[in-house]
Amino acid sequence: MTPPAAMNRPAAMTPFAALHHRPGRPLLLPNAWDHASAAALAAAGHPAIGTTSLGVAAAAGLPDGAAATRAETVRLARRLGRDGFLLSVDAESGFSDDPEEVAALAVELAEAGAVGINLEDGRPDGTLAPSAVHAAKVAAVKAAVPELFVNARTDAYWCGTEGPEPEAVRRLDAYQRAGADGVFVPGLGDPAVIARLVDGLSVPLNILWSPGGPGLAELAGLGVARVSLGSLLYRSALAAAVETAAAVASGRPVGPVPGYAEVRALSGS
């Protein structure tokens, strides 16, 4: 990759985009799956909140990565877009390989109040979509909604490709040239590779936090601009629910939890 001037701050920038251009202070983006989880995270002081496609799909009893979750994704965006935080929506692959259909989805999300969208090149069958197809989606979305922050994700480290670094570099270059505002590489935890990607990109790099991987401070030092939590919070909530039930069943004490009134307040009631 040959960047023009890596991480230069554009003259005009949305508040959400600006959170990606704070050297040494990456945006920590927690991911919600419903209104209550998003409201709780906003109340805790997070200025921007993403959605998790796995959490949204699983909470609705739907498979992650399937076109059936499109309606749930839009429905949740319409609810969350009315709140006071900056909302970025995990739109999977755009639920279509037709760039114009993906652009139409982006328009719906922007009209709902979303300021960012995540688009991934991984497919439900574990393969990668052709990079040209994904780049066309990115370009179509930017043409339709220029102010929407497009975070183009490659699943090169998740889809079993041989030599994932060269494949990721090739794809990220195609996506930033198509107009992506940022790029995302989940599954990457090697500090040396992260540093090389940051050096070669002209747009902010997003990394998925993972247990055993680099911490927030180390990622900041590597030049990462955004750190996402993905489905971690949803999976943690499931684990906490099961553990709490087990504690009650075995007579063990239960840890502190929000009160009834606190939860009601999250919905404004």
Question: Over which residues does each language-model region extend?
Answer:
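Extended, intrinsically disordered, low-complexity segments
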Residues: S231-S269
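Alpha/beta enzyme core
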Residues: N8-L87, F95-L229, R235-L238, V242-E243
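Actinobacteria-biased recognition of intrinsically disordered, low-complexity terminal regions
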Residues: M1-M13, S269
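A general boundary/transition motif marking the beginning of the first structured unit of a protein
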Residues: P4, A129, V254-G255
